[in-house]
Amino acid sequence: MARFNLATLLVTLFLAVCTFSFVSAEGRGPVITDKIYFDIKQGDESLGRIVLGLYGKTVPKTAENFKQLATGENGYGYKGSTFHRVIKKFMIQGGDFTNHDGTGGKSIYGNRFADENFKLRHSTPGLLSMANAGRDTNGSQFFITTVVTPWLDGKHVVFGRVLEGMDVVTKIENTPTGSRSKPSVDVVIADCGLLPDEPAKEAAEHAEL
């Protein structure tokens, strides 16, 4: 009887640990697999840097598209493009590196690709989500929310969030705009790319010493 009780206790403890681990992992939110930087300029003024974390485990295809467009490894991408649409208390939109007005852009998979999934909600400001022209029309255009936008759930794919530089997003949000919500002075992604993995970077720095 004592042996049975011990076995039962061990099984119960094991299940409790597994459950706690699962809940803890879920509580941390989506896994960030890559960090992308945007260095922003408006006219001759540097507005600062935005660092974006990509949810490559939850939406790997969408995250990979954004990453490769940020690095420009295919010969085209976000560098030099603008935030062409800015709506206060809503979002800032960019990613049209072909026409620069919201009518263009393309993905690394061709012109357009399908909605990957809608697992993540627009539940907080600072989320990175795909702009589209309807179902399964993702290309290169994206937006960053500045408020909670639940009406976009199930229509736009959330694939990352702002890790640093929300103050820069706010500067862009507050810039004067003209027709079609286009900034009066172009807001440009002057430089962009993939930030090195911090543990790998630290190891390399120590190796050089």
Curated annotation (Swiss-Prot):
Protein activity control: Inhibited by cyclosporin A (CsA).
CDD domains xrefs: cyclophilin_ABH_like
Sequence motif: Prevents secretion from ER, positions: 206-209
All copies of domain PPIase cyclophilin-type, residue ranges: 37-194
Gene3D superfamilies noted in UniProt: Cyclophilin-like (2.40.100.10)
EC number(s) per entry: 5.2.1.8
Predominant place of localization: endoplasmic reticulum
GO annotation terms (biological process): protein folding
Glycosylation sites: 138
Domain of life, source organism: Eukaryota
Catalytic activity: [protein]-peptidylproline (omega=180) = [protein]-peptidylproline (omega=0)
Keyword field: Endoplasmic reticulum, Glycoprotein, Isomerase, Rotamase, Signal
Subcellular location: Endoplasmic reticulum lumen
Signal peptide (from-to): 1-25
GO molecular function, one term: cyclosporin A binding
Family: Belongs to the cyclophilin-type PPIase family. PPIase B subfamily.
Functional summary from the UniProt entry: PPIases accelerate the folding of proteins. It catalyzes the cis-trans isomerization of proline imidic peptide bonds in oligopeptides.
Protein's UniProt name: Peptidyl-prolyl cis-trans isomerase B1
